Amino acid sequence: MIAPWESSWKPSGAASLLGLRPPVILLLVTAGAEGDQGISSACAFNATSMTRDMRGLMTTVTAFDESERLIWAGQAGAYADSFARLCAFPVEWLLDAAEVRLGTRVLDVGTGTGAAAAAACGRGAEVTAVDAEPSMIELAALNTPMADVQVAALPSLPFKDDEFDAVVANFVLNHVGQPLLALAELRRVTRPGGRIALTIWSAPAAAGQALLGRAIQAAGVTRPAHLPPLSLENDFPRTKQGFAALLDKAGFVEVSCQTLNWDHHTTSAEWWSGAVAGVGFTGHVVASQSPELIAEIKRHFDLLSAEFTGPDGSLWLPHTALLTFGKV
């Protein structure tokens, strides 16, 4: 549940990286971020050899985690009406990569409104779905009545070791303050030989991803101090090599990463509605401005949208994401 534009408006460099939510950051999708710095040596602990007790001792709620909770609080309805379709696009590829089929015990982490969970149920899988945001869980439960849906947040999940055959996380790693520790937790709950598949927004952002961020920047709005970026020591490059290397570091094997490119078809009204409602990082920035500044951002949004507008007035927004998968 991570929005790609969350990555498009910020200075370059690792200090600006946000990390996924579909719509999505993300997600985060949050989302990817500018720059191509390597994983910091501060992340050099051995994730494969960590015991559950050790993980518990190391788990902290970072400032980034706290800002993500603030950003997404109560936003499920607005997200469903604006950016959810975008984030649902890779779901079938995600489930294929995790080899989700009839009888697979699958965990959908950061389920959002339940797109991946619902698709997995449609394949006959035994689905458990979690999200950190209660309003998302309410919608996911309605959309996936056959799944076990509950509130839970990385990097500490309420499941036994080796409980699942497969784990999927659609635009989720963008929205956690400790990505490597989160992956270690996903590895813990996946059985030996089980599979994991994750998506994040890539960097640099595709043109459609950058639209809202460009409008904010053109209006002269700067990043709010109460929304900290992902810390340098927890950051990683939003590239095929960087994403795959992070899974390698977390102890997964047979890791592979591929790029997904598509044009998201939407309308100007739908796209703007998510921003002005405060959905995701970029939406939160927009909605927190004065009425005058919001109007100025909207003016630039309308001007910049022209290059993506089709003959019927609808928008075709290019997006790029990374799909990475591996085995325990």
Per-range role (PLM):
Residues 113-115, 232-328:
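Conserved Class I S-adenosyl-L-methionine
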Residues 105-157, 166, 181:
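Class I SAM-dependent methyltransferase SAM/SAH-binding core
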Residues 166-180, 202:
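A short SAM/SAH-binding and catalytic strip from SAM-dependent methyltransferases
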Residues 51, 55-104, 115-119, 135-139, 195-222, ...:
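Conserved class I S-adenosyl-L-methionine
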Residues 180-195:
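A short glycine-rich, Lys/Arg-flanked "PGG" loop and its adjoining helix->strand segment in the class I
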Residues 5-12, 16, 21, 40-41, ...:
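Low-acidity, Ser/Thr- and Arg-rich intrinsically disordered low-complexity segments
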